[in-house]
Amino acid sequence: LGMYRKGIIERIKQDKELNSNFVGGSARNREQLYALNLLKDDDVPLVSITGLAGSGKTYLTLLTAIADLHAGKYQRIVITRNVIPVGKDIGFLPGDMNDKMMPWIAPIMDNFRQGLKDKDLTYFNVMKDKGDIEIAPLAFMRGRTFNDTFLIMDESQNSTIHELKTVITRIGE
């Protein structure tokens, strides 16, 4: 497996593991290995991953973000997604913005739980309370700049080109 870079084909590193004190995971196939190498590559500022449901797109991205946060590469993780329901909408949700976003980030929470070594979401909640992880609705992206941030845009296939451009142009240093 190789990647074309600067006029040559470089061999993909076979390091399938992604471990820190808090999370652990590994690539299960060549596609995941390729995605993991792109996510871990500091020379690649934007990675877009496509695949079937359950292929590990969100899982690998989230684990990489947490490992990079703990390695000091980033100051925080921002997770966003479009709030477009699959079926009929259930209407307005009670609570503050975090409460309203919880049903939409349930897949991310599932992936976080899967990647945590102790399988307890307390760690996620502590990180969220400290501001290390932020849940940001796509509707409120305008005017923001994300410096020193690992930005995850989950389920981006539900977004328009305008929404995608809005998010991409928010990425700072």
Per-segment meaning from a language model:
Residues 59-127:
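Conserved P-loop
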Residues 1-16:
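Interdomain "pre-motor" coupling segment immediately N-terminal to P-loop NTPase/helicase cores
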Residues 131-166:
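Conserved RecA-like ASCE ATPase "motif II neighborhood" in helicase/translocase motors
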Residues 54:
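Walker A (P-loop) phosphate-binding loop of P-loop NTPases
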Residues 41-42, 70-72, 142-145, 159, ...:
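Conserved catalytic network of the ASCE P-loop NTPase/AAA+ motor domain
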